[in-house]
Design a protein with these regions (language model features):
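Residue-level recognition of tetratricopeptide repeat
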Residues: 57, 93, 127, 188, ...
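Structural marker of alpha-solenoid helical repeat scaffolds
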Residues: 44, 78-80, 114, 148, ...
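Canonical tetratricopeptide repeat
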Residues: 54, 86-90, 124, 158, ...
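Helix-start (N-cap) detector for alpha-helical repeat units in TPR-like alpha-solenoids
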Residues: 49, 82-85, 119-120, 153, ...
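Structural signature of tandem alpha-helical TPR/SEL1-like repeats
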Residues: 65-70, 98-107, 132-144, 149, ...
Length: 338
C-alpha cells in the first residue's frame, strides 16, 4: 500500500514537471527581448488568451514593457486563440518603439501569416522596408494596406502599382481608422520618382483621414517644395510646426524653402532652432553649394569654422568643395575669354 502511495506521488510529480515543461515550451522566446522571463512575474499562468492579453494591456499601461511583451507572447500559445494577428501587431509595435527592427519585422510578418489583411502590420512593414532602402517592397506593402482598408470599407480592393492616379485616389473610401502612414508613405515614394500629382493626392487623402498628422503635413510641404511651389510648401510645413514646433524634418524643410527663396539669413535663423550655430552655418553653406551658389556658401562655411575651428571638420570639407567649384568656374571663364 505504501509502495502504491509513493508511486502515485512520484507519478503526480512527473506529470507536474511535464506540464511545467510543456507550458514553458509554449512561450515563443524568439519574439521576446528583455529581462529574463523568470524575473517578470510570480503570478499563476493565465488560463485564457483574453486573460493573457488583459495582463499585457495592464503591464503596458504601467510602463512595464517587458512584462507586457511576455504576456502578449504567452497569449499566442492558446490552441484556440482568435486574436493572434492583432497581438502580433502589438508585439511588433513594442519592438519598433525599442528600435528592435528585426524582431518588429518578424512579428509583423507573423501577424500577416495569421491574417494577410492586417492593415496595421502591412502599413508598418511598408515603412520598415522603405526606410531600409527596399522601396519596391515597401511600396507593395503600402498598396496591400490600402487594399485591405478598401475591403474593410467595402470599397474596391483592386489597387495596383499600375492603376494609381490622382483621379483613382479620390475614389478610395476611408474613415478615421484608415492607414494614414500608408497613404503618406506611398505618396513620398511617388514624389521620389517625380510624380508629384499622384503623391499630393495620396498625402492629401492621408490628411483627410487625420488633418493634424505631422508627417503627412511635412511630406505634403516637401512635395510642393520639389515642385518649386514655395508658398504652398511653406504653408503646410508651418502647419506641421504649429502642431509640433520641435519637428526636425519640418524645421529643415522650412530652412530649405527660405534658401530656395534667396533668404539665407532667414534659413540660418530657422536651422538654429534645433542645432548649434556652427552646424546651422554649415547647413546654409552646404545647401547653397547644392543650389549652385558656392560663392555665397563660402562666407557661411568660414564663419562655421571660425566658431568652432577644432571641431568643425565637415565645414572645412564643404569649404574646400565650394572653393574648388569657384576656381573651376574661374578657369573655365578664362579659357572661354581666350
Amino acid at each position: 500500500m505504501l509502495w502504491i502511495k509513493k508511486y502515485v506521488i512520484i507519478s503526480l510529480l512527473v506529470l507536474t514537471a511535464c506540464a511545467t515543461n510543456e507550458q514553458a515550451s509554449d512561450f515563443d522566446s524568439s519574439l521576446y527581448s528583455g529581462k529574463p522571463v523568470e524575473s517578470l512575474t510570480n503570478d499563476e499562468p493565465p488560463k485564457t488568451e483574453e486573460e493573457a492579453i488583459s495582463r499585457g494591456d495592464i503591464a503596458l499601461t504601467n510602463k512595464n514593457v517587458d512584462l507586457a511583451l511576455y504576456e502578449y507572447i504567452r497569449s499566442l500559445s492558446f490552441p484556440n486563440a482568435v486574436h493572434k494577428d492583432k497581438t502580433l501587431y502589438t508585439v511588433g509595435r513594442i519592438h519598433l518603439a525599442r528600435e528592435n527592427y528585426e524582431l518588429a519585422d518578424k512579428a509583423f510578418r507573423a501577424s500577416l501569416a495569421e491574417n494577410p489583411d492586417n492593415i496595421g502590420s502591412l502599413q508598418e512593414l511598408g515603412t520598415l522596408y522603405t526606410k531600409r532602402g527596399e522601396k519596391d517592397v515597401g511600396k507593395s506593402y503600402y498598396i496591400r494596406a490600402l487594399n485591405a482598408d478598401q475591403i474593410r470599407m467595402k470599397g474596391n480592393p483592386n489597387i495596383t502599382n499600375d492603376n494609381i492616379t490622382a483621379e483613382t485616389v479620390a475614389t478610395y473610401r476611408y474613415d478615421d481608422k484608415s492607414p494614414v502612414a500608408a497613404y503618406s508613405g506611398l505618396g513620398v515614394l511617388y514624389d521620389v520618382r517625380g510624380d508629384h500629382g499622384v503623391a499630393q493626392a495620396l498625402i492629401r487623402k492621408g490628411l483627410d483621414i487625420d488633418p493634424r498628422n505631422v508627417n503627412a503635413l511635412v511630406s505634403l510641404g516637401y512635395s510642393y517644395y520639389m515642385e518649386k511651389e514655395y508658398s504652398k510648401a511653406a504653408h503646410f510645413t508651418q502647419a506641421a510646426l504649429s502642431i509640433k514646433p520641435s519637428d526636425e524634418r519640418a524645421i529643415n524643410n522650412l530652412g530649405l524653402i527660405a534658401l530656395a527663396k534667396d533668404q539665407p539669413r532667414q534659413a540660418l535663423s530657422i536651422f538654429s532652432r534645433h542645432m548649434t550655430e556652427p552646424e546651422a552655418l554649415n547647413n546654409v553653406g552646404y545647401f547653397l553649394i547644392l543650389q549652385g551658389k558656392p560663392d555665397e556658401a563660402i562666407p557661411y562655411l568660414q564663419q562655421a569654422i571660425d566658431k568652432n575651428p577644432a571641431y568643425y571638420e565637415l565645414a572645412n570639407k564643404n569649404l574646400e568643395r565650394a572653393l574648388a567649384i569657384v576656381r573651376e568656374r574661374q578657369d573655365t571663364s578664362s579659357v572661354v575669354l581666350q
